[in-house]
Amino acid sequence: MNENLFASFTTPTMMGLPIVILIIMFPSILFPSPNRLINNRLVSLQQWLVQLTSKQMLAIHNHKGQTWALMLMSLILFIGSTNLLGLLPHSFTPTTQLSMNLGMAIPLWAGTVITGFRHKTKASLAHFLPQGTPVPLIPMLVVIETISLFIQPMALAVRLTANITAGHLLMHLIGGAALALMNISTSIALITFTILILLTILEFAVALIQAYVFTLLVSLYLHDNT
């Protein structure tokens, strides 16, 4: 019997209980807190990447926005490491679950919106009505801007889910095609396998890029509200 194409996206269970919580906690092991005075190469590389990313993320923020630095860095490290671990064979990628991505996107989006209404109430309300709007269009524009505001967390979650899921499905299909072609034509199977390797390299880049894009959009939402 052929394996279900979406079997790899099913939440794994142990004795009937989902173990996704353990899987989500696993990436934290990859970033240990060093106890030595002199860091090794891996820790130094991690610190350099964090400093480089934090400079790019926080350059546009004022002092109030920079208080979110730890949250943003933790977010990009968590999503990036989770996406990369999901590329390992026979592994599970939590970021292919829309429910989990919504669980990250909605609280972060709500936090930025609440921050804006608490500290910049007039400016936040002004976003619902662009300056110079004709009076007859005011009700319609308010409704449109309200809908666009509430669509933001959904767009965050769907973008991450769709990109990660599409890559995994494509790798699954090309890998299955390479195995099927081995009995038909070895040369075509080798070409297909080469395409699979190139796609895998591309998926490594996509995993990191999607983590950066997700965090960058949260950072931009925060910038608009601080």
UniProtKB/Swiss-Prot annotation:
A single Gene Ontology CC term: proton-transporting ATP synthase complex
Organism: Felis catus
Location of the protein in the cell: Mitochondrion inner membrane
One GO MF term attached to the UniProt entry: proton channel activity
Membrane topology summary: Multi-pass membrane protein
Protein role: Subunit a, of the mitochondrial membrane ATP synthase complex (F(1)F(0) ATP synthase or Complex V) that produces ATP from ADP in the presence of a proton gradient across the membrane which is generated by electron transport complexes of the respiratory chain. ATP synthase complex consist of a soluble F(1) head domain - the catalytic core - and a membrane F(1) domain - the membrane proton channel. These two domains are linked by a central stalk rotating inside the F(1) region and a stationary peripheral stalk.
Coiled-coil positions: none
A GO biological-process term: proton transmembrane transport
Catalyzed chemical reaction(s): H(+)(in) = H(+)(out)
Assigned protein family: Belongs to the ATPase A chain family.
Keywords: ATP synthesis, CF(0), Hydrogen ion transport, Ion transport, Membrane, Mitochondrion, Mitochondrion inner membrane, Transmembrane, Transmembrane helix, Transport
Protein name (Swiss-Prot/TrEMBL): ATP synthase F(0) complex subunit a
Subunit-level organization: Component of the ATP synthase complex composed at least of ATP5F1A/subunit alpha, ATP5F1B/subunit beta, ATP5MC1/subunit c (homooctomer), MT-ATP6/subunit a, MT-ATP8/subunit 8, ATP5ME/subunit e, ATP5MF/subunit f, ATP5MG/subunit g, ATP5MK/subunit k, ATP5MJ/subunit j, ATP5F1C/subunit gamma, ATP5F1D/subunit delta, ATP5F1E/subunit epsilon, ATP5PF/subunit F6, ATP5PB/subunit b, ATP5PD/subunit d, ATP5PO/subunit OSCP.
UniProt xrefs under Pfam families: ATP-synt_A
Entries under PROSITE patterns matching the protein: ATPASE_A (PS00449)
Residues passing through the membrane, by range: 12-32, 68-88, 97-117, 138-158, 164-184, 200-222
